[in-house]
């Protein structure tokens, strides 16, 4: 009998924001400061203003190659990602939860991060997943809409009711998948929200799946 699918968001769900923040607010500003001869803090403020100008709803926002080109930093983006590998950090319960859940489910990863980012950030846990999906790299989309989850179902050859998704964004990881018929859980690590299908860590998720 085919296992059902358990789908995870990445940043804020499995991984903290440490790696992403280090790349965008330390690594890129450091390279920009060195290339253009400006103080680091000035470079960081300028780059942040440029990130805000483009906005997170544009696919290029998630593309490290785009920012290297835009800021005149060459093409050695892979070196920067590898340099900041020590900043990759998972929430404490993640390894054991993935190990246990992988016995009962096919694990899927769905993220807004570009594939270049995702491949580096998930390397230590990649073996738990049967498939990984980057909204930006694989579908050219930045929002996980109900229609997006429909595309995911079709690409997997699965019915919506065969997939459970969990993530930390109310709209993209909870409302949208439920809108297409998936079972979904909202992960609120702040503990501020309470209710059915709301969990505060992945240990609580595991108990809900039983």
List each model region and its residues.
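Asp-based, Mg2+/Mn2+-dependent phosphohydrolase catalytic module
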Residues: 1-6, 99, 108-210
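N-terminal helical cap/lid subdomain that shapes the substrate entry/recognition surface
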Residues: 2-96, 116-117
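A generic short-segment signal for beta-strand/edge and adjacent turn/coil regions
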Residues: 33-37, 76-79, 101-102, 132-135, ...
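Non-catalytic interaction surface on structured domains
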Residues: 90-95, 102-107, 182
């Amino acid at each position: 009998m085919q296992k059902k699918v358990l789908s995870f968001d990445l940043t804020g769900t499995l991984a903290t924001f440490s790696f992403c923040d280090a790349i965008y607010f330390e690594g890129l500003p450091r390279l920009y400061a060195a290339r253009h001869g400006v103080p680091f803090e000035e470079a960081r403020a300028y780059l942040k203003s440029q990130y805000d100008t483009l906005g997170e709803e544009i696919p290029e926002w998630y593309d490290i190659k785009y920012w290297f080109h835009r800021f005149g930093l060459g093409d050695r983006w892979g070196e920067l990602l590898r340099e900041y590998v020590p900043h990759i950090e998972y929430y404490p319960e993640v390894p054991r939860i993935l190990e246990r859940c992988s016995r009962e489910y096919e694990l899927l990863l769905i993220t807004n991060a570009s594939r270049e980012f995702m491949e580096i950030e998930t390397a230590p846990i990649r073996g738990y997943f049967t498939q990984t999906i980057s909204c930006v790299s694989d579908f050219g989309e930045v929002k996980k809409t109900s229609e997006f989850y429909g595309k995911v179902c079709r690409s997997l050859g699965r019915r919506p009711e065969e997939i459970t998704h969990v993530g930390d964004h109310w709209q993209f990881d909870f409302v949208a998948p439920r809108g297409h018929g998936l079972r979904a859980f909202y992960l609120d690590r702040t503990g501020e929200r309470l209710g059915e299908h709301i969990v505060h860590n992945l240990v609580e998720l595991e108990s809900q799946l039983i």
